[in-house]
Amino acid sequence: MAEGFAANRQWIGPEEAEELLDFDIATQMNEEGPLNPGINPFRVPGITETEKQDYCNMLQPKLQALRNEIQEVKLEEGNAGKFRRARFLRYSDETILSLIHLFIGYCTYLLNRKELGSLRHDIDIEAPQEECYSSREQSITDNIKYGKRCFIGTAGLYLLLFIGVGIYLGTAKAQVVWRLPPLVVPVEESEIIFWDCWAPEEPACQDFLGAMIHLKASTNISIQEGPTLGNWAKEIWGTLFKKATRQCRRGRIWKRWNETITGPLGCANNTCYNISVIVPDYQCYLDRVDTWLQGKVNVSLCLTGGKILYNKYTKQLSYCTDPLQIPLISYTFGPNQTCMWDTSQIQDPEIPKCGWWNQIAYYNSCRWESTDVKFHCQRTQSQPGLWLRAISSWKQRNRWEWRPDFESEKAKVSLQCNSTKNLTFAMRSSGDYGEVTGAWIEFGCHRNKSKLHTEARFRIRCRWNVGDNTSLIDTCGETQNVSGANPVDCTMYANRMYNCSLQNGFTMKVDDLIMHFNMTKAVEMYDIAGNWSCTSDLPPTWGYMNCNCTNSSSTNSVKMACPKNQGILRNWYNPVAGLRQSLEKYQVVKQPDYLVVPGEVMEYKPRRKRAAIHVMLALATVLSMAGAGTGATAIGMVTQYHQVLATHQETIEKVTEALKINNLRLVTLEHQVLVIGLKVEAMEKFLYTAFAMQELGCNQNQFFCKVPPELWKRYNMTINQTIWNHGNITLGEWYNQTKELQQKFYEIIMNIEQNNVQVKKGLQQLQEWEDWVGWIGNIPQYLKGLLGGILGIGIGVLLLILCLPTLVDCIRNCISKVLGYTVIAMPEIGDEEETVQMELRKNGRQCGMSEKEEE
């Protein structure tokens, strides 16, 4: 019997109370009884001596009754099995506690487990014997069931931990492909750009994504020099001209030129070639043609296909240029355009030449000068026609109006115009394609709306001093007897009326074709009958090219001398060269499809929701413009990259939801077209390398993908860690210093796309293996979350135990219920005869001994 019980048989101490409560619990159990019919408070883990004394005081009446019951109890045949089962459950509980503490890493419990929640001395056993329990005695208790699960779970946890560590160590040095990085670089000279125009006033350009013109942002990024939009000026001009005239109808042949090209021996031996040049005639409407030709339409050029414009002056990135007034034909008055007068320095034939050297007159020191000159024109009715009755308002009643006969060949739309300044023009200059006789000038004229006439614009040509001899070329100057030249006065004096006419056609060379555009019908539809006037509408920023004229000392033959000391060049403005000059400030850049960076980028990449494909808008505009311009290092850019993704994702979702609610069809049209266009553009980027990136393990929503080690080792894609410097380098510097690395990855993509035999075979094997074990690659991510959760819960429980003593009793009860804590029940026996038998019961049945023999 315990020492405390022997000292005072009336007062029941903690040790005797513990055994009495064990007996009380054991009597409630059967062979297949519940695992935990009750909890012995004296066996709660961590109970103190003071708490045991308090329990004794509270439970003293109950304990006295249990002691009396034990003295009267009869040891029945079934009691031995109950005691053996209680003892088995006690040790099974200790096993479960060991597994749980092993699971949470509390290994010191394994060393001190016999001191926790048990008597200071265990049940006395004279000689340790091997205990054996039948399966009926063990049964399938909750402890056994959960113990097996806990053991399997613990083993699986550590197995996954080892696998995860192995995978992490195996991929720690992997290299990562950063898809669509926040970076812009110059395009190559050989790259093809796709562009279109946007002009709100012109239907020919309204089919483009007009809203893209507003997608721009300032940046302090410095981009390496590369091709500008001016490199494609000729192609852009040709396309714009076709857009301006695309609604023109082709009619009959306007002119046919027959020429003979002789061979090196003349026409001997049939070496002559007869060439016939056919100039077709196109009928056009003035409102769709003339405004474009004179640069009256504000046109923005926008890039597609992932290309972006970088304004070298304003440091802005945008999809479109600022609105430009682009004249499509040669003009005397035009925007500021640099021209060269020294022919020895002219390499590009499209650059306008500012002087001539085949005359004695030598034009040099050409300069562009702005001007405020105005041309005023008025028309007086003088053509044959008929009086027609016109219906007027009720006040004026009906009246008769004069309508000229436009179908008559004698009908000619003539005007009288004057200039506000004296204009002296240079020697010879061509007008369109085909010589214009006499002194001449062309300009645009605007007519305001009135009661009898609508608002309109016309192209007017004024000619004076037209020579009678068509074989001679009218040349500005006063020198007589010049071979092949007819001297004319090319000065247009201020406030002097000159005979002018509406220009009803013009000839242009587009690409390799010469075309004549007939606008006779367009002129008729603008109601030119009657008396009206117009004023030139030259933009205030336009001017002309003024050159100094000096006479050379050459006197070999009679040549035309300078009429004045200065001369204005007619049709000096070259539309292609002018367009090139306007577009030189726009550098064409692109966002790389991918950037190879070290694997450590994945360490400081925040966990965020994957973005949808239309969030490429943020990558191509907001991020590339604002983010890349901060000059931040690669480490900071990764975080900012995902912040922009998340922010823009939320913005797009909110805008789309608002549009659905309000059902603003007209307002949302441009937005929908913009989003569709950007989706297509982003999909093109993904589809271009879709197969290759998929084989590398990247899906369409992933922006960081690891390159398989066998690939970057095979292609020797070694990253210079010194240059990377743990991410303390800007992405622009990294791209410039690792171009060879990016090129090698491009070779990998191309090899995969071209179904390289070796790569294809390896990828097939990799695909078969990945179908089975592909989920292993995500284990480290899962383990991080699982391990972090377990550690967090463990630390939280530990803090509660240490910092909240008032909740200790509640926590004990909860732990006992969760762990299924069970105690043993051993009754006290007073007779010596029964002592031996009880020792057998306490020790359990020996192997090979029946219950009756044991009793």
Curated annotation (Swiss-Prot):
Where in this protein does the record put region Fusion peptide? 615-635
Coiled coil regions in record: 642-692, 735-771
Q: How is it modified after translation?
A: Specific enzymatic cleavages in vivo yield mature proteins. Envelope glycoproteins are synthesized as an inactive precursor that is N-glycosylated and processed likely by host cell furin or by a furin-like protease in the Golgi to yield the mature SU and TM proteins. The cleavage site between SU and TM requires the minimal sequence [KR]-X-[KR]-R.
* Cytoplasmic membrane side: 806-855
Look up keyword Glycoprotein and say if it applies: yes
Single GO term (MF): structural molecule activity
**Which GO terms of the cellular component aspect does the record hold?**
host cell plasma membrane; membrane; viral envelope; virion membrane
> For side Extracellular, which residue ranges?
1-784
Q: Name one Pfam family in it.
A: Env-gp36
* Keywords recorded for this protein, A-Z: Cleavage on pair of basic residues, Coiled coil, Disulfide bond, Glycoprotein, Host cell membrane, Host membrane, Host-virus interaction, Membrane, Transmembrane, Transmembrane helix, Viral attachment to host cell, Viral envelope protein, Virion, Virus entry into host cell
Q: Name one GO biological process term.
A: virion attachment to host cell
Transmembrane region positions? Answer: 785-805
Q: Assembly and partners?
A: The mature envelope protein (Env) consists of a trimer of SU-TM heterodimers attached by noncovalent interactions or by a labile interchain disulfide bond.
What is the protein's given name? Answer: Envelope glycoprotein gp150
